[in-house]
């Protein structure tokens, strides 16, 4: 992901990365914050407290959600995400967090990771019912990864309805996209992932706000 002409200093945590391009994320605006947010960071993250960028890399998605939340509690927000093989052929999820000194909102992140697209759609909808907004998606081996966020300071929750489309044929995806947008859904993101039974699968996520009860 391009970070502009003036690129702030960055601190890299985990393995060094060769040839990884970070995908851009849509912006919108969430786990329980520790009493002292800064104290939740690791020693190396604490040393990076004056830097604008933080790079997180892990093979476990559960670890990534925890580290993202710790960074968010210290004032960072999601800037980019990519899943892939790093230097030694290990599948890793890589996330870049960026500090925004002007932001005063408290953000909670939720990371979803599933092999089955049907399971992902169910988990997406549970997150949408809780007011989580789509931020980004990628793939990691045969897993589809989606990151959502919500502002913990909001007094009321805007529920979101999500729709996940998955097909091996792009022509079929075009037809399903047209039908979804005609029903009021807005495009959120798309990835090409390894299918559970081999081959590639196009995975597209759309959303629309829930109105009424």
PLM feature spans:
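Bacterial N-terminal signal peptides that target proteins for export
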Residues: 1-12
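Hydrophobic helical h-region of N-terminal Sec-dependent signal peptides
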Residues: 13-18
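C-terminal motif of bacterial Sec signal peptides marking the signal peptidase cleavage site
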Residues: 21-24
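Terminus-proximal functional modules
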Residues: 26-213
